[in-house]
Amino acid sequence: MPSNKNTRIENIDFIRGVAVLGILVMNSLIFALPVSAYFNHSSEGATNIIDWIIIFFQEIFISQKMMGLFSLLFGASFVLFLESLRIKGYKKPKLIILWRNFILFLVGVIHAYFWMGDILTIYAILSIILLFLHNRNILLLLFLAVFFTYFSSILALIFQSFFDSEGNLSKTIIEQSIFTDKIGLGKFWFSDSIILGEAMSLYFLVDIACRSLGMMLLGICLYRLNFLSAEFEKKTYINKLIIPGFIVGIILSLISLVWYQIEDYSPEIALIANIPNKIGIIPLVVSYVGLCSLLYKKISNKYSSYFVSTGRMAFTNYLSQTILCFIIFNLLFSSNNFSRKEIIIFVFFIWIIQLIWSKYWMSRFNQGPLEFIWRKITYLGKN
């Protein structure tokens, strides 16, 4: 039986493995289809009932939740890494972690050139805030976690008022010259548009940053409360995390999906209809933490080790997903005319590859290839 420390770390890696695989489900859409298909499901890639079943599953269980789970684990790992630096006796652990995340920022800048949805740069910047907040009172952290995560809902309400019923910038906003390019929802909502525009670019930047920071802070809270340790009883995970989280999260996500359907994906509700889904992020992500922790405790190491290995190589796997998507959807096939079921087949194929190769690699090495390089540069000249 592994020690408590190893169990805690492996459980985090197990959950991270699930998260990095789950992220691909949504990220692949932006490579394979026009950007609008990610948000306006009716715009592209939905030609039959199978496609709509996939959309239903993605929106209820995956969309924003897997990124939320990934962000949560980043927050937890941030504290775990800082603790390990202090235990090892490094004199300036905060400088090391700042340097480590500066490297992450540089990688993210390069990554963003190939992938408009890069989150590494945002994570690296937000790590500065985590450095100042990670050891604050846990009730304050919980409050800030909820506030920042749900601020994106307020943001959606505000930005929706910037657009008219056709998805163009309203006359009032144009007259005030707030956004000089005068572009409305753009390619966020319309498949025939090729420009995102200043308004939606600002919305995305603030939205993603706030949600990421909120979930990172929640991850720190769960870590400090030992919910990521996989040490609680089965009934604790089921009664406190899984059941309430699933019930609340699924209902809220379902409300958003039904709202879009009822309004026939009208530009008038492009942002506000997603608010219930955003509110459902925390409940569902927390339930995933409970479910994954329970699975890690219950299933054989023979099977859990595949996900643990994938999680330990999350940095490598996340970037390799971009490379594979770029090659397949941008170089080999550039029509942007895929159906959802074709994309999900591709996703399953990549899952199998990453699970197998991660297990193979980690059975021979202590770290993934990019993790090894990142670590070497992080500790360069440090003592």
Placement of each model-derived feature along the sequence:
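Solvent-exposed interhelical
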Residues: K91-P93, I129-F147, C221-P244
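Long hydrophobic alpha-helical segments that form multi-pass transmembrane helix bundles
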Residues: V146-R224
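Specific transmembrane alpha-helix
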Residues: G68-E83, L120-F132, D207-A230, K278-S300
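Juxtamembrane membrane-water interface segments that cap and precede transmembrane helices
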Residues: A46-I60, L185-S201, D264-L271
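Aromatic-anchored segments of alpha-helical transmembrane domains
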Residues: V25-S28, F105-A112, F148-I158, I247-I255, ...
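Alpha-helical transmembrane segments of multi-pass integral membrane proteins
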Residues: D264-S363
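N-terminal signal-anchor module of multipass membrane proteins
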Residues: M1-L73
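Functional transmembrane helices that form membrane-embedded active or gating regions
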Residues: R8-F14, V18-V20, N239-I242, Y296-L324, ...
